[in-house]
């Protein structure tokens, strides 16, 4: 089984020798080549082979700016025995009005460019995060009903067609507190999207945060899984958790090292293994203070399940 890491794992001030997130961005801005070389060296030292790019300063455009071209990024990876496994598209949750034609056109254009980068660097999957829900009972209350889901699913289908034209599969990621993480919501969007163009990236910890059984949910859509995020959680989060710009930080206290939480890892590993050894399994540890040690530990634990 092939293992990689999402670069969000390195989004911790301690790793960079600074005191907050803003200083990480400032450090990257001062010397992008040094920033990305340190990043790729750390991935190499962690023992996994695959890289998943994500939001800035770990964005694919940052990588191109650091090395000069997509081909140069690929060369930098190959020199370290690495490859691009996938790229995470964050744009859907960052548009104020995702239903607008202008916003959709921007995202489609970004996805097209991103897919070309992914292919140039040896990858074949674009993972996409879905828009957030609203806080429970926050006025005006919004529900995820058929009309809302159908409209968004139509755009997701178009997005999947766009990336498929570039040879890249689009996979929906189960981000907690998004419209695609509670078991019913996952089932709904899997029903409404076309399986030829829209695939599935189950994230074990995020499904658990929403009160779901990661294995049961993933098993219902096993044939559409083309990549998976491996992460553990201690418990589900309260239904009235505030959903705002700080939601990702609220998730972090509920995450834990693999094997110390509620994910049924033996069953999860069996399910993912059944999809084939060539599929990427991404270790995503959300801002680890010592990311290299954390990835090594997670990789060793996952390896003990899959050998």
Can you describe what each PLM-predicted range is?
Residues 1-121, 299-307:
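N-terminal pre-domain/capping segments
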Residues 3-9, 51-53, 84-88, 126-128, ...:
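Hydrophobic faces of well-ordered beta-strands that scaffold small-molecule active sites
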Residues 18, 51, 153-256, 262:
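Acidic/histidine-rich catalytic cores of soluble enzymes
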Residues 25-34, 145-151, 250-262:
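A short acidic, glycine-rich active-site loop
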Residues 30-33, 54-69, 92-98, 103-107, ...:
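Acidic-and-aromatic substrate-binding clefts and catalytic sites of carbohydrate-active enzymes
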Residues 46, 121, 196, 219, ...:
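Structured loop/turn residues at beta-strand edges in well-structured enzyme cores
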Residues 76-79, 96-200, 266:
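Active-site acidic/histidine proton-transfer and metal-coordination neighborhood
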Residues 260-274:
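A short, acidic, amphipathic alpha-helical segment used as a generic capping/interface helix at domain edges
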